[in-house]
């Protein structure tokens, strides 16, 4: 029998009507528990019920994005009747445990404070203050373990998807120490039950907290300072703790595995990091009409054209922009982070002016900045400025969510991805596009080196070099060379284009589904030995 797995994550993306996700981490978690359900694997998700979810993005008159945090209807939450208590600073916080199974997912348990005075903890996903962030992580980790115990679930594997959940491991050690087991022995016992997934390929992106603040806020669960330091160092590094608390860890693509092993190689006592490439939930992200049309060149092209018209209609309804269905349409939709270089294509003004003036291509952008990220806000404002500079040729669609993501990854002709290599851990939006026959034009980062057959199922931007002088300039030149020399000529040859569409659908369906990912987790991460 496969082990029963508790999958901890700060966010879960199941549907746009349930906005408790911010980006790729949450969408991955949602796809994971959907595939676990489809495969009848014994998995239960553990997270938090965010009162207002993630932001609703609005554009001001000058094109600067603003954020709203509306409440959302949640009549699909089932109360388990279980209540747990955790200490946050000087206060005992009682939390209700909800259960969600509405979207064809494995059971998802969500904790939420009962008292109105404690609801600040789950008011908003990823609060910027230290007190709020640590309180959220205490509720997720410590509260999550206590909820599983109270529900009587016999969990054999505790999977921490990113470092936010590591206080669950601290709580599990404290449980054993309360029974008289010495710290080191308790740690060794707990480690046999924990696995850990790391996502962040740069040290600065990994969360670190002053140990004194963790003690003040109650995250130490009765462990003394030297014991906490053994786990995560001082200051306490959440990723280091995840690596030391787990018997096995994984990165989320082959390249990310190389980067992560190099980044954490000097951490004493860290678990081995293997690479398990992410995947996406095919029934959620692949249009059923594409599945039906596979194998028919005429049917595939006609289906794609229908999906493209649906995208352009949605853009017109949301923005008033009217794009041309006969023009090559490039999509770019992802979180507004500087390393993703969303505006790279605009940095050679003469070349983009020529392509757009000649109506050879049109560009569709979407993506949210973190509400407290000024640089991300500037990135979005710049994309809006480009849309105003090139009306009906460039468009920015606000309020990117799962619903818009489905329309974009089904209706674009090409999916553009140009991060600074190797900073994109995986990049699952490209997998969603590929499932629908949307061809990737991407830097060789994340998942794409494993999938790209240049000129046959998509295109590589550049040669995969990183850390080189003027990387932006090199990648920009490679982007234009590939776009002008390969992509545009291929689009003019319908037979070749449709063959490439079929090839990219085949590779995405065969190798980059979340069903494959879940099976690989059970075989390589959860299994003993």
Where do the model's predicted regions map?
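Catalytic cores of carbohydrate-active enzymes across secretory and cytosolic contexts
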Residues: 1-529
């Amino acid at each position: 029998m496969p082990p029963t797995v508790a999958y901890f994550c700060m966010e879960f993306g199941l549907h746009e009507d349930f906005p408790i996700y911010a980006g790729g981490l949450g969408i991955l978690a949602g796809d994971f528990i959907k595939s676990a359900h489809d495969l009848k694997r014994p998995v239960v998700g553990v997270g938090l019920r965010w009162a207002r979810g993630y932001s609703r993005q609005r554009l001001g008159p000058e094109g600067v994005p603003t954020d709203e945090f509306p409440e959302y209807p949640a009549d699909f939450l089932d109360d388990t009747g279980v209540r747990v208590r955790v200490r946050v600073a000087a206060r005992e916080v009682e939390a209700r445990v909800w259960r969600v199974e509405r979207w064809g997912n494995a059971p998802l348990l969500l904790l939420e404070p009962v008292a109105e005075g404690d609801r600040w903890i789950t008011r908003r996903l990823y609060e910027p203050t230290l007190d709020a962030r640590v309180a959220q992580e205490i509720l997720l980790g410590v509260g999550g373990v206590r909820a599983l115990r109270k529900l009587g679930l016999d969990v054999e594997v505790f999977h921490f998807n990113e470092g936010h959940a590591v206080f669950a491991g601290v709580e599990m050690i404290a449980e054993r120490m309360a029974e008289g087991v010495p710290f080191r022995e308790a740690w060794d016992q707990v480690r046999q039950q924990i696995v850990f997934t790391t996502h962040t390929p740069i040290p600065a992106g990994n969360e670190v907290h002053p140990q004194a603040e963790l003690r003040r806020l109650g995250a130490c669960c009765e462990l003394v300072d030297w014991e906490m330091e053994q786990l995560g160092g001082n200051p306490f590094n959440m990723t280091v703790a995840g690596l030391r608390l787990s018997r096995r860890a994984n990165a989320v693509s082959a390249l990310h595995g190389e980067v992560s092993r190099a980044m954490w190689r000097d951490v004493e006592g860290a678990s081995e990091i293997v690479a398990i490439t992410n995947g996406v939930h095919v029934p959620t992200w692949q249009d059923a009409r594409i599945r039906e049309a596979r194998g028919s060149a005429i049917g595939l092209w006609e289906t794609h054209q229908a999906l493209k018209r649906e995208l352009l209609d949605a853009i017109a309804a949301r923005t008033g922009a009217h794009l041309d269905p006969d023009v090559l349409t490039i999509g770019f939709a992802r979180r507004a982070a500087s390393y993703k270089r969303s505006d790279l294509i605009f940095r050679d003004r003469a070349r983009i002016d020529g392509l757009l003036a000649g109506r050879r291509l049109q560009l569709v952008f979407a993506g949210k900045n973190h509400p407290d990220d000024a640089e991300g806000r500037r990135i979005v404002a710049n994309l809006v400025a480009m849309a105003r500079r090139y009306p009906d040729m460039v468009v920015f669609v606000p309020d990117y969510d799962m619903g818009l993501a489905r329309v974009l990854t089904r209706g674009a002709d090409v999916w553009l991805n140009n991060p600074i290599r190797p900073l994109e851990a995986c990049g699952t939006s490209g997998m969603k596009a590929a499932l629908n026959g949307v061809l990737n034009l991407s830097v060789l980062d994340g998942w794409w080196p494993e999938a790209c057959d240049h000129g046959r199922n998509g295109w590589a931007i550049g040669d995969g070099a990183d850390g080189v002088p003027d990387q932006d300039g090199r990648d920009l030149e490679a982007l234009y060379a590939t776009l002008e020399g390969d992509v545009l000529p291929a689009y003019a040859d319908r037979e070749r284009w449709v063959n490439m569409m079929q090839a990219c659908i085949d590779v995405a369906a065969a190798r980059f589904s979340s069903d494959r990912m879940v099976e690989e987790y059970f075989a390589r991460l959860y299994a003993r030995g």
